[in-house]
Amino acid sequence: MRSALKSTVVLLIALMAAACSNGGGASPSASAGATASAAIAASPSTAESVAPSASPNACAKDTLTTVTAGKLTVGTDNPAYPPYFQIPDGTATKPWELGDPTNGQGFESAFAYAVADKLGFAKTDVAWIVVPFDNSFAPGAKKFDIDVNQVSYKPERAQAVDLSDGYYTLNQSIVALKANKIASAKTIADLKAYKFGAQTGTTSLDTINNVIAPTAAAKVYSSNDDAIAGLKAKQIDGLVVDLPTAFYVTAAQVDNSVIVGQFAPPTGTDAEHFSVVLAKSSPLTACVNAAIAALKSDGTLDSITKEWLADKASAPVIQP
C-alpha cells in the first residue's frame, strides 16, 4: 500500500524488517542446483495431492513449458508492498515501488525464489513482471508462469485459473485510529455499529460482509491505497486487511493507528490461505505444488515465514 509519506517509508521498512527478522540475512533455501525432481523426492506424499502425472521426470527443468524458454516469469502487483517485498537498503529496481521483488527480500520474494530453486531455475533465470491484483486471477491467457501476490484461495477464482496449495495461512484483521472508539472493541458484537472499508474483490471485503456483518454497508475502494486514505480521512472507522498488511499499515503508513484485532477462522472451517496463481490447466501446477510441499517438508517455508512476517500471536483476537 503506497504511503502518502514516502519520505519515511524506507526507514520504517528497514525497522520492520529488523523487527520481523529471525536473525537477518538471506532466508534459507535449497541448494542452487536443486530441481523439481529433488522437491518431489523430498515429499513422497506430494504426488497424491497433485495431478497424477507429476513425476520427477515431468518436473525436470528442461521439460517444463514456460512463457520464455529457460526462464520463469513471475507476476506481482506494483507497488510491491512490504512485508511481502522489501528494500532494506532503500534501493528499488525500476519500475518497482515500496518493495522490490527482484532482490529476494520480503516474504513473497523469498518464497518465489525458493519455488524457482526447487524447479531448477537460478535466480538469474527468474523474470518479474507487473500484474495488477485483479488481473492475476481473471479469465484468459497469462503473460506469467506464476503469480505471487497475496491471492487467497476462493472457489470462484479457481474456476478461471489454477490456484496452488497454500503457502501461508492468514487471518483478516482490523486497523483503526487509536482515537476512535472502535479501538477498544473485543467482540464481533462490539463492531456492528461501525463503518468499515476494504479493497474491492478481496477476502477482506468478504470478511466485512460475512463475518462482521455491520449495520452500515461496507465502503468499497478500488485499491488499498485508497482505503488507507479513507481511514486517514475518517471516512471509515475500521480498515480490514490481512494481518501482515495490518502490521505494516500501523508501523509505516497510518500514524496513531492500532490493530483492533484479528479474526480466527470459525470452528470447523478451513483457514484462509495464499495460493500461487497459474493459468488454467497450466502444465506447471503439479510441479509448483510439489515444490511447495518440499519447502514445507525441509523447513524452508517455515524459516522464510519467521524471518519476514510478524508473529500472529502479537495481535489480539476478536471474539465471536
Report the location of each language-model feature.
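C-terminal motif of bacterial Sec signal peptides marking the signal peptidase cleavage site
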Residues: 15-19
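Acidic, polar ligand-binding/catalytic clefts
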Residues: 124-190
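Bilobed "Venus flytrap"/periplasmic-binding protein-like clamshell domains
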Residues: 74, 79-81, 101-119, 151-155, ...
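A ligand-binding cleft/hinge motif common to bilobed small-molecule-binding domains
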Residues: 135, 151-160, 209-210, 237-270
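Extended ligand-binding regions for polar small-molecule ligands
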Residues: 47-54, 111, 118, 195, ...
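Periplasmic-binding protein-like
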Residues: 168-176, 251-290, 311-320
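Extracytoplasmic small-molecule ligand-binding "clamshell" domains
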Residues: 53-148
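Bacterial lipoprotein signal-peptidase II cleavage site
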Residues: 20-32
